[in-house]
């Protein structure tokens, strides 16, 4: 069966799989987040990639690229290579699920940690040409200088922005590395070295091969079951039904839409429709 995945040697920091792999390095993750948010993280207590959060068995779950905590902050970091719309409401949902999870574990409202959501976008999410969009809740009536101070912030990086002059050097260099793989700072040099070392590891290569083969199995198994179902209800109907199931499964496993397009042969609009219909 034809492979639709990048060869291991060609993976970059901007590929979802490698992004999560590199960001699991505590030092790199800490430095990237500090650079983006211009804050200090005292000590990371917890860091995980591809974490699934669900507030109840019946609730819609979310799967996060990177989630880390220190003593007073929870930070979610997402890499977005394609504009699937709805990022603002997705950020809102991430933070609400994170808060509910914390209170279910016994945390009082007043003790909730500050919550940050970061979207690193290879497109302009608000089409305003700005390199950096930061949002928090303020008073719209009379005095916008009054802040709600609920401890939540949402940050969107527009990696494609042309004018980065208002960003500091370290953040500019991170943009340049993500966009063009230019190494200009200690942080981007560390990321580049980690990338090279990871790609040189035989076990890491094997893990990636297992990952891609598992995804290819979705297609093979899906079409096989679809054809079998089609014997009873019509070949085309069976294949279409199973294709939708395969798409839903892949979306729930956080597979990028451009990858799903190549595997199942649907376009992005068709996949988005399936995503909406199944509340994935």
Indicate residue ranges for each PLM-predicted region.
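Accessory alpha/beta interaction modules
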Residues: 1-153, 165, 225
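Short, charged alpha-helical interaction segments and adjacent helix-coil junctions
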Residues: 2-9, 17, 71, 75-80, ...
């Amino acid at each position: 069966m034809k492979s639709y995945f990048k060869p291991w040697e060609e993976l970059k920091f901007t590929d979802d799989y490698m992004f999560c792999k590199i960001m699991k390095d505590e030092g790199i993750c800490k430095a990237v987040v500090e650079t983006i948010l211009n804050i200090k993280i005292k000590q990371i207590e917890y860091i995980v990639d591809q974490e699934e959060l669900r507030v109840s068995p019946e609730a819609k779950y979310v799967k996060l690229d990177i989630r880390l905590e220190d003593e007073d902050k929870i930070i979610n970091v997402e890499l977005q290579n394609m504009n699937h719309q709805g990022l603002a409401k997705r950020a809102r949902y991430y933070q609400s699920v994170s808060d509910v999870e914390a209170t279910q574990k016994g945390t009082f409202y007043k003790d909730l940690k500050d919550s940050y959501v970061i979207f690193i976008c290879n497109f302009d999410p608000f089409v305003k040409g700005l390199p950096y969009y930061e949002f928090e809740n303020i008073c719209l009536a009379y005095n916008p200088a009054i802040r709600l101070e609920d401890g939540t912030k949402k940050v969107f990086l527009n990696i494609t922005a042309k004018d980065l002059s208002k960003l500091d050097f370290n953040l500019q260099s991170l943009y340049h590395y993500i966009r063009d793989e230019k190494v200009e700072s200690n942080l981007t040099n560390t990321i580049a070295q980690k990338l090279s070392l990871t790609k040189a590891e035989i076990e890491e290569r094997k893990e990636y091969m297992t990952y891609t083969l598992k995804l290819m199995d979705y297609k093979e198994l899906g079409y096989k079951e679809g054809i079998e179902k089609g014997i009873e209800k019509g070949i085309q109907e069976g294949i279409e039904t199973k294709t939708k199931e395969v798409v839903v499964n892949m979306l729930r496993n956080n597979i990028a839409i451009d990858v799903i397009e190549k595997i199942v042969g649907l376009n992005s609009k068709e996949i988005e429709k399936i995503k909406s219909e199944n509340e994935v």
